[in-house]
């Protein structure tokens, strides 16, 4: 499918979706705790439903009531588990792999064609070092894991994905010995690790930080039943803010901001550096944009999901926008650096692709084009917002938004966007 996107202005109120990362983590931890654990204000999307289905395969009894998930009975580690298909969700397969290593019987985990291109080897090596038997297809899914891991000393690289570390942390308290975790190389996406630890603490597990982002100790413990409220998703909020900056007129973004750590909240600072005035209330955000953005140099090493919403702001920037230290964005659902470079140049802006980022510079010759999002949800949304600014665009793969923001097109059209399926 494709969507036709015409030049358009948005105004009014729009509600930001709940946080995908916290929804994943809270569902897994509620499923490990059971006993009526409840996750409120969840994001119900294709990715998070993959986590729900994985937990059910592990034996958890889960009910969905409106925007809440209730876990009556926890994961059963003596269960024979059928193959788990995590669809397109990298978070699901990585955390589920850690949990699978707590079972004695072999468990197979797989995903769709895109997921089968994403690396797993660093996590598999770490699990193997503490007693798991792991098989894969050249370090990628499908994978087979046989436990049971006993715990102990584990070393894992931090420069691929923080999801590997999150998987080890979540499984650690349920091992016989606990885990002493050492992270080598520079850790990317640090705030996502903070999110994992914050969620674990909400479910009663203590994580001892020996050296931040380098060494952690998790002793044998149990997860306790809890109620967890998911905050808004700053990754999705960044896209809505970009839409308001480029195309907004009195646009108000509503949602439960909360006080849990989110790496992508740095987008507020980025907007202010670009010259945007941002007013944050208890449950809403308003912005006021200058006629032209300032441009600047931005390090996205800890927030790779901000690459799509930041790149499109170059359309209305008087100076170049340079994005650095985000090489790991090439390992997302797609190679977001390469695809962004390839597609945005069609709109008439100048793009220099570097190994770890991009330099983007607007021109006076912006023009509509067909933009191929390669079935990447964040690229689809970013390209639609760009199309609203430039006009006369076509964007491929609208179905991709099911993984993070299923109502994106409908909600944007409700406040004035002109995005029509073809």
From Swiss-Prot:
<dbReference type="GO" id="GO:0005737">
    <property type="term" value="C:cytoplasm"/>
</dbReference>
<comment type="subunit">
    <text>Monomer.</text>
</comment>
<feature type="binding site">
    <location>
        <position position="189"/>
    </location>
    <ligand>
        <name>3-phosphoshikimate</name>
    </ligand>
</feature>
<feature type="binding site">
    <location>
        <position position="163"/>
    </location>
    <ligand>
        <name>phosphoenolpyruvate</name>
    </ligand>
</feature>
<dbReference type="InterPro" id="IPR001986">
    <property type="entry name" value="Enolpyruvate_Tfrase_dom"/>
</dbReference>
<feature type="binding site">
    <location>
        <position position="161"/>
    </location>
    <ligand>
        <name>3-phosphoshikimate</name>
    </ligand>
</feature>
<protein>
    <recommendedName>
        <fullName>3-phosphoshikimate 1-carboxyvinyltransferase</fullName>
        <ecNumber>2.5.1.19</ecNumber>
    </recommendedName>
</protein>
<dbReference type="InterPro" id="IPR006264">
    <property type="entry name" value="EPSP_synthase"/>
</dbReference>
<feature type="binding site">
    <location>
        <position position="90"/>
    </location>
    <ligand>
        <name>phosphoenolpyruvate</name>
    </ligand>
</feature>
<dbReference type="Pfam" id="PF00275">
    <property type="entry name" value="EPSP_synthase"/>
</dbReference>
<keyword id="KW-0963">Cytoplasm</keyword>
<feature type="binding site">
    <location>
        <position position="21"/>
    </location>
    <ligand>
        <name>3-phosphoshikimate</name>
    </ligand>
</feature>
<feature type="binding site">
    <location>
        <position position="162"/>
    </location>
    <ligand>
        <name>3-phosphoshikimate</name>
    </ligand>
</feature>
<keyword id="KW-0057">Aromatic amino acid biosynthesis</keyword>
<keyword id="KW-0808">Transferase</keyword>
<feature type="binding site">
    <location>
        <position position="332"/>
    </location>
    <ligand>
        <name>3-phosphoshikimate</name>
    </ligand>
</feature>
<keyword id="KW-0028">Amino-acid biosynthesis</keyword>
<dbReference type="GO" id="GO:0009423">
    <property type="term" value="P:chorismate biosynthetic process"/>
</dbReference>
<feature type="binding site">
    <location>
        <position position="20"/>
    </location>
    <ligand>
        <name>phosphoenolpyruvate</name>
    </ligand>
</feature>
<comment type="similarity">
    <text>Belongs to the EPSP synthase family.</text>
</comment>
<feature type="binding site">
    <location>
        <position position="118"/>
    </location>
    <ligand>
        <name>phosphoenolpyruvate</name>
    </ligand>
</feature>
<comment type="function">
    <text>Catalyzes the transfer of the enolpyruvyl moiety of phosphoenolpyruvate (PEP) to the 5-hydroxyl of shikimate-3-phosphate (S3P) to produce enolpyruvyl shikimate-3-phosphate and inorganic phosphate.</text>
</comment>
<feature type="binding site">
    <location>
        <position position="25"/>
    </location>
    <ligand>
        <name>3-phosphoshikimate</name>
    </ligand>
</feature>
<dbReference type="InterPro" id="IPR013792">
    <property type="entry name" value="RNA3'P_cycl/enolpyr_Trfase_a/b"/>
</dbReference>
<dbReference type="GO" id="GO:0008652">
    <property type="term" value="P:amino acid biosynthetic process"/>
</dbReference>
<dbReference type="InterPro" id="IPR036968">
    <property type="entry name" value="Enolpyruvate_Tfrase_sf"/>
</dbReference>
<feature type="binding site">
    <location>
        <position position="163"/>
    </location>
    <ligand>
        <name>3-phosphoshikimate</name>
    </ligand>
</feature>
<feature type="binding site">
    <location>
        <position position="378"/>
    </location>
    <ligand>
        <name>phosphoenolpyruvate</name>
    </ligand>
</feature>
<comment type="pathway">
    <text>Metabolic intermediate biosynthesis; chorismate biosynthesis.</text>
</comment>
<feature type="binding site">
    <location>
        <position position="305"/>
    </location>
    <ligand>
        <name>3-phosphoshikimate</name>
    </ligand>
</feature>
<feature type="binding site">
    <location>
        <position position="20"/>
    </location>
    <ligand>
        <name>3-phosphoshikimate</name>
    </ligand>
</feature>
<feature type="binding site">
    <location>
        <position position="336"/>
    </location>
    <ligand>
        <name>phosphoenolpyruvate</name>
    </ligand>
</feature>
<feature type="active site" description="Proton acceptor">
    <location>
        <position position="305"/>
    </location>
</feature>
<dbReference type="GO" id="GO:0003866">
    <property type="term" value="F:3-phosphoshikimate 1-carboxyvinyltransferase activity"/>
</dbReference>
<dbReference type="GO" id="GO:0009073">
    <property type="term" value="P:aromatic amino acid family biosynthetic process"/>
</dbReference>
């Amino acid at each position: 499918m494709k969507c036709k996107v015409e030049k358009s202005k948005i105004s009014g109120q729009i509600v930001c979706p709940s946080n995908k990362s916290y929804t994943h983590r809270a569902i897994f931890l509620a499923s490990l705790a059971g006993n009526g654990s409840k996750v409120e204000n969840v994001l119900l999307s294709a990715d998070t439903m993959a986590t729900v289905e994985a937990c059910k395969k592990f034996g958890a009894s889960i009910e969905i009531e409106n925007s809440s998930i209730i876990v009556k009975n926890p994961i059963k580690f003596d269960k024979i588990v059928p193959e788990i298909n995590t669809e397109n969700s990298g978070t699901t397969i990585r955390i589920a792999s850690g949990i699978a290593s707590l079972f004695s019987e072999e468990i197979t985990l797989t995903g769709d064609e895109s997921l089968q291109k994403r690396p797993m080897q660093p996590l598999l090596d770490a699990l193997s070092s503490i007693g798991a038997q792991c098989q894969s297809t050249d370090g990628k899914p499908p994978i087979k894991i046989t436990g049971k891991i006993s715990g102990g000393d584990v070393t894992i690289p931090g420069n691929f994905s923080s999801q590997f570390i999150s998987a080890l942390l979540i499984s650690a308290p349920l091992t016989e010995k606990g885990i002493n975790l050492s992270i080598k190389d520079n850790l990317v996406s640090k705030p996502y690790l903070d999110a994992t630890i914050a969620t674990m603490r909400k479910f009663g597990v203590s994580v001892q930080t020996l050296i931040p982002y380098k060494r952690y100790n998790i002793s044998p413990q149990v997860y306790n039943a809890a109620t967890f409220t998911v905050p808004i998703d700053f990754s999705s909020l960044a896209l809505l803010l970009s839409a308001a900056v480029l195309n907004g007129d009195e646009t108000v973004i509503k949602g439960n901001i909360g006080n849990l750590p989110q790496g992508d909240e740095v987008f507020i600072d980025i907007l202010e550096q670009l010259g945007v005035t941002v007013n944050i209330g208890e449950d809403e955000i308003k912005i006021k944009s200058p006629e032209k953005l300032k441009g600047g140099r931005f390090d996205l090493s800890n927030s790779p999901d901000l690459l799509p919403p930041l790149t499109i702001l170059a359309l209305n920037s008087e100076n170049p926008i340079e994005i650095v230290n985000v090489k790991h964005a090439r390992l997302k659902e797609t190679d977001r650096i390469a695809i962004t470079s390839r597609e945005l140049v069609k709109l008439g802006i100048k793009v220099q692709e570097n190994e770890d980022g991009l330099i983007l510079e607007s021109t006076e010759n912006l023009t509509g084009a067909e933009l191929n999002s390669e079935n990447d949800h964040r690229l689809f949304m970013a390209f639609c917002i760009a199309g609203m600014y430039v006009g006369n665009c076509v964007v491929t793969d609208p179905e991709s938004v099911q993984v993070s923001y299923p109502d994106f097109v409908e909600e944007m059209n409700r406040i004035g966007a002109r995005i029509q399926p073809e």
